[in-house]
Amino acid sequence: MKNELTKKRFFTGLIAGIVMIALLAGLEIAEPKKATGQAAGTAAETTVSEGAPASEAAATAAPAEPANASVSADTEGTFTAGTYTGSANGFGGPVEVTLTVGDAGGITNAEITGSSETPDIGGKAIPTLAQQLLDAQSAEIDGVSGATFTSQAVRDAATQALGKASGMETMEAPKAEGDNLFIPGTYTGSSTGFGGEVDVTVTVSEKSIDDVQIEGSHETENIGTFAVEMLDDRILEAQSPNVDALTGATVTSNAIFRALNDALVAAGADLTKFPAAGEEEEGLKSYEELSTDIVIVGAGGAGMTAAIKATQAGKDVIIVEKMPYVGGNTTKATGGMNAAETHYQAEQGIEDTVEQFVEDTMKGGHDINDRSLVTVMAEYSAKAIDWLDSIGAPLPKVSFSGGATNRRIHAPEDGSGVGAYLVTAFRKNIDELGIKVMYETKATDIMTLDGAAVGIMAESKDTYYTIHAKAVILATGGFGNNEGMIVHYKPDLKGTVTTSAPGITGDGILMAEAVGADLVDIDQIQLHPTVEQGTSMLITESVRGDGAILVNQEGKRFTNELLTRDAVSAAELAQPGSYAYIIFDQKLRDGLKAIEKYVSTGITVQGDTIEDLAKQIDVDPATLADTLTKWNQYVADQKDPDFDRTTGMENDLSTAPYYAIKIAPGIHHTMGGVKINTSAEVIDINGNAIPGLFAAGEVTGGVHGGNRIGGNAVADIVVFGSIASESAVAYCDK
């Protein structure tokens, strides 16, 4: 018999049950809280005090009055005395809530454990969340700002525990008979991912998983969506729910696993019968030799640009990528691409010059940039925009960004994040051109012969590779996710949140250095001023470029929001608590698609009025209202007497509702790296080009100097990815 069983979240059933019990008891039921423009339960989150002691990711809270003291009429007698436990997945792993109910029917003790949560964020929030459970006498707690996922996990786990205390545990699912693994049929489970609901539908026969369908269209494009695309095949291959999470997409992966487990339990499975992930025996690795014209290490923006252009030029190309998907740090780019004298600027009446682009970049980099590299990037930028047009990736929306004199940063028409947009387009071209991409394969060494690069050594889970090539292009990104390297060059950044993708660990820099490459500006590491600390999510510079402002915890502006990133970061760190709020309105939200991801992720706070917003973020309402009134007048006058802001003032902030995101600086870009010349050739410690070795993107140094201007990273990867490709093609033809 074919079963159709959809597992919905237990919460819905629990609320219905509590309502029924309360009605029978004659109790008054309050209307449930409604989410407004963000994840449920985050609208009025409490902020953890900066002076609060660090948590060991475990906390117990109990009321001051003796246990079993009387509780309010709203909760008295609702729950049965005893101790009850529930669990749910947080940001890093399982979170467990244990609640003790006294004889009077109220919660008398709350204990939360979550050893996998980020210590300074989710872990720090746990004591506050435990106290909130006691104060609320329910699972409907406000949560902690910046610890969205941990807060939601506590709500879900507490809901489970209180369900048990209410005597409303779910009916035990049927079990497969005999030595069968499943009851044949099709089953669906649901869970909450990074951007919304994730559904997993499985079709099973008595002893096998026959089909897996995953739906998670709201997950982050080219990060979570890769987990949605790839984990179904891995689950089918393993014939088990216990497969490794996709690196870099842990939240989405965990949501898929929760939904899958629900579906399999409904199918009669005993989950303890499946081996844990990674328990399969490892055999001896095989050895394989490959040959190609050009081998490219890294499938981020620079690597994919180089691969597409080299293939278009008639060369055979292999890309080696250590992650299970393409994109690298390019996926994280949310702003746009700087380019001067483009046809889009001309069509929109924007006056800009290559020379001004160069000067802005040099000034932003504190004049330690290599001017020759900057000049080439600026001169090539319009041509790069034309090439993006030709491959189906136009960037027609032109606006301001920090450090730019003119409207120069080019973005997708709908204002969506440029990185995910370009990665999707690059990937489509890679597939259409049939370029070989070796996923989950890590390059370990550059092979040389008589001083020239002649290929690479690499390895995957089960194979060692020798890849012979006429030319090698390094496009592995920087080292923003290698804390050891970060701390080595900048000890004061230890423990700082990073926006970098998981694979950005400096591999290419180390490989190049091993064959004699020189390094430049290696200690220049950039902080981005607008990073949501709980999720490491970067708030695109376009939000400020389109008119948003920054305020401190007093509700006051404190800087020109569109100064260079290092200047704005320094200004934030000087504020009480070393954080700020970015404030914007509905009109700005409507014009910038990237904001929808912030809303769906639950990191925004929304208020119907400025005063309402101020109360929710614990800022003085009168002060914030005065700040907005002044700012709107400055926009009308096109003059900012407080901080001399002259750009991003086309739109005021007067359209309700209003939004805020709590932000602080985070590691964003490593400006230093392998030294290259204007042909993207890698330079050795003696100042000579290493034959056959080229590099592009964040793996290189010299372009950005002491600070990278917003929009220049994408310009760098497309321009120098193109130049590296052209130079490698020419080298192959010698």
Question: Model features per residue range: what roles?
Answer:
Residues 289-292, 460-471, 689:
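Core beta-strand elements of the Rossmann-like FAD/NAD(P) dinucleotide-binding domain
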Residues 325, 329-436, 440-442, 548-562, ...:
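Conserved N-terminal/central alpha/beta ligand/cofactor-binding core
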Residues 9, 31, 37, 73-281:
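Active-site- and interface-proximal helix/loop "cap" or "latch" segments in soluble metabolic
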Residues 289-319, 729:
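N-terminal Rossmann-like FAD-binding beta1-loop-alpha1 element of flavoenzymes
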Residues 509-513, 517-623:
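An anion/pyrophosphate-binding glycine-rich loop and adjacent beta-alpha core
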Residues 445, 623-707:
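A glycine-rich dinucleotide-binding beta-alpha-beta segment and adjacent secondary-structure elements
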Residues 460, 467-531, 723:
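Glycine-rich loop(s) and the adjacent beta-strand/alpha-helix scaffold that form part
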Residues 484-510, 661, 700-732:
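A conserved FAD-binding loop/helix module that cradles the flavin
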